[in-house]
Amino acid sequence: MEPRGGTELQFEYLRKHVDPKLLDQVQITTSVPEKIPLHPTKLNILWEKNSYDQPNLAPWFKDKSNHHKYDWYVFNSNWSYEKFRMAFDIPTEKCVVIKNGVENINPIQSPYVKGQPIKIIHQCTPWRGLSVLLGAMQLVKNPLISLDVYSSTEIYGKAFHEQNDKHYQALYEQARQLPNVNYIGYKPNEYIKEHLKDYRLFVYPSIWEETFCISALEAMAAGLYCVVTNYGALFETCSEFPMYIPYSNDYKSLAQKFAQGIEVAAKALEAPGIQGHLDMQKQFVNRFYNWNIKGTSWTRFLQGAINAK
């Protein structure tokens, strides 16, 4: 299996929504500088999705003599751009922010009715906060609430999975043993998008500085109420719509706060104004993050960059 994480999926959308003749005039490298050789004649663009502190890119950026090698740097959030700017003094005149997008999300069809089951989805990789979420679920008392976990290393391909998945087996087993948790494991993005409508909450106690969060954005587009930390670029991605739990590196305390947040979010589903809130959330995502719009942003950027060369 080849990797199909957020980076790969966004590149698929880029190819779908931007004229291939335009893309053929540039070479776009994702995240890790010079993982493919610089092209001698085309515009070289680094589409940066990783965090500024990652060891596979930080040394390259620290050497300022490298900065001229790319014609443009594209960041997927202003948060990430600011981190790179402050950490490495990158040439700002060669930088642009074009955020990620979503496509073909099936929304929830009917408002929540009191007494119905409340299913939570969590489809983030295991090192980003699954341990905190499982700790929280042990404290959740509402019998209507259950969690489906799709967390796996398989999303990053066979080689990564075989090398790293063993480190998380104990965590998966813990999920299997909890009565209010169903461990499902990896499902492709198409499956996740098709089944988001079966859930009411997306809960992500992120302990990883996301440069964006496609999982959260897809959940928002489907009309799920989201409970997340305010860590990294999550606040920029999700705007005012989720319930934010302040990040803490005391993970036991964070789990306790998320347990309370889950209970409150479940109760909020019964509130008279919640449907209007979730409808506005869906409209927000579709207005600003639809890939038809992102495709236009990329097209304009690439045309301008090529013309200015």
Task: Locate the predicted segments by residue.
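Acidic anion/phosphate-binding donor-loop and adjacent secondary structure
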Residues: N56-L57, R85-M86, E93, K99-P117
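A short, active-site helix/loop in glycosyltransferases that binds the activated sugar's phosphate group
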Residues: D71-K94
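Nucleotide-activated donor-binding/catalytic signature segment of Leloir-type glycosyltransferases, i.e.
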Residues: H161-K187
